[in-house]
Amino acid sequence: MALKLLFQCSPCSPSSLAPLQPVLVLVRPPSGAKARRNLRCCASTQVTELMTARRSANYHPNIWDYDSVQSLTSDYKAYTYLERVEKLKEDVRRTLQEAVGLLDQLELVDCIHRLGVGYHFDKEIKEILKTISTEPNNMGLIDGDLYAMALYFRLLRQHGYEVPQGVFNRFMDDSSSFKASLCNDVKGMLSLYEASYLALEGETTLDEAKAFTYRHLRGLKGNIDSNLKGLVEHALELPLHWRVLRLEARWYIDTYERMEDMNPLLLELAKLDFNIVQNVYQGQVRKMSGWWKDLGLGQKLGFARDRLMEGFLWTIGVKFEPQFAQCREVLTKINQLITTIDDVYDVYGSLEELELFTKAVDRWDTNAMEELPEYMKICFLALYNTVNEIAYDTLKEQGVDVIPYLQKSWADLCKAYLVEARWYYSGYTPTLDEYLNNAWISIAGPVILVHAYVSMIQMITKEALLDCVGSYESIMQWSSMILRLADDLATSTDELERGDVPKSIQCYMHENTASEVVAREQMRARISDIWKKMNKDVALSPLPQPFKAAAVNLARMAQCMYQHGDGHGNPHRESKDHILSLVVEPIQLMES
């Protein structure tokens, strides 16, 4: 690779790692030409510094000021609010117990979940659904009611019960197509559309249901109830099964308030609970902001993205419930380290430096730091100390040494980063399969999920760790692959412009001589297919339910964060609005 010097040599400082100030510009060499990557610049007899070519990503600056983050607070930690929530929970619990009709029970359970307060009633909801699943006469009660049948199917599948796709055969004609008369039942069509996203591989009836309902819901005309119309538009933008739970709760609270059959006590509980949990988030993000400032990595490595608030948003998406505060704090730290190290590999480090850093992480030994340049020493030590501290807390609380598993996940990540760096520096375009076999690891999903596991699962054993994270369970692969493809769909063009390895879209185009439009459609189809695989794992995997939920939620968060562009690397209006709604701005309560 040829290097082009753009300035007069002057005294060089290894600590000057500011963005937008590349020392040299990279120019790809002609095919077969040898790359010359390093230039020694001597400004005086006392100062001799090896100059290495640096790329610039032109990332947007951090939009969340430290002092503003530290000032976040609310009144919803007051005892009067907490006392009121406990009273409302008892009222809603009584409502659950008194609901007797099958459809009434299903609608109440669905509403409680969508409002974000289902975690308060896990025991009651499990008992209701268990009873519903074992009652032989239930099919007869909702036979012919598409809305009720689809709601029954979706809720039971969401909670791990086996419900065959054949329950929808009664809504199909002799040619195995859905009856045209169903198009008049908008509520039923919407319910079937949402249910179709719980499909497993090979369930062609549900594939047909999705295509049929999507086609007709898209073409709705005439006078439709405004609330129902809003629900349809919301579902067509992104189905409920793919949505981030806490963001969905915030949206649905506003929607539910406008419904004629709204339960005011349930609505009040949802609003109060949202604000109280938001207060928990504010305390956490203040703590994490202080940790990040004290770590000093953002100030020292000015080329890297500073995305603390966006990183914290990811953790809410993965586990929003207040009892998983430790998991969110661990993942916030991990997200910051991932973002920084990703920028070291993608933007700042030379290939030689990246080889050394990968070896250091693989060895997990501070002695390996000796060969690293100064900025990498800082980065490695921040990683080493943070991960070891997480492992120490786990050892102290559970008596299990998790360092080998955490270290392995980081070593695998850095090795995957290095593969992509080698591809970039050699100008190599991998096949799509070759790319994806590496890319589901390089997107850092396994690192996130391994750390999520050790920070939220009680009674960890070495055997369970080995089964779960030692070889990366398939549910981790599916979640990570959705994360990768969603990222590629949003960021591949920008990443190629700043200099990066071809992504899945470009690999498909190169391998199949296809247009970008076709390649993007293929990646979206892959995401849909992978969701079916993950649905199966959620139902059948013996892994702890909180961990399976975290894996699913990571995929949901990916599709949210990259739905309108790169909501992490270059935060857009939507990601800012998500942070404001979940962390900053409480829901206004009605005056009593």
Curated annotation (Swiss-Prot):
Chief location category: plastid
Xref: InterPro entries: Isoprenoid_synthase_dom_sf (IPR008949), Terpene_cyclase_plant_C1 (IPR044814), Terpene_synth_N (IPR001906), Terpene_synth_N_sf (IPR036965), Terpene_synthase-like (IPR050148), Terpene_synthase_metal-bd (IPR005630), Terpenoid_cyclase/PrenylTrfase (IPR008930)
The record's note on its domains: The Asp-Asp-Xaa-Xaa-Asp/Glu (DDXXD/E) motif is important for the catalytic activity, presumably through binding to Mg(2+).
EC number from the UniProt entry: 4.2.3.111, 4.2.3.112
GO biological process terms, semicolon-separated: diterpenoid biosynthetic process; geranyl diphosphate metabolic process; monoterpene biosynthetic process
Lineage of producing organism: Eukaryota, Viridiplantae, Streptophyta, Embryophyta, Tracheophyta
Transit peptide: 1-42
Positions of disulphide bridges: none
Protein name stated in the entry: Alpha-terpineol synthase, chloroplastic
GO CC terms of this entry: chloroplast stroma
Binding-site list for Mg(2+) 3: D487, T491, E495
Native source species: Magnolia grandiflora
Cofactor note: Binds 3 Mg(2+) or Mn(2+) ions per subunit.
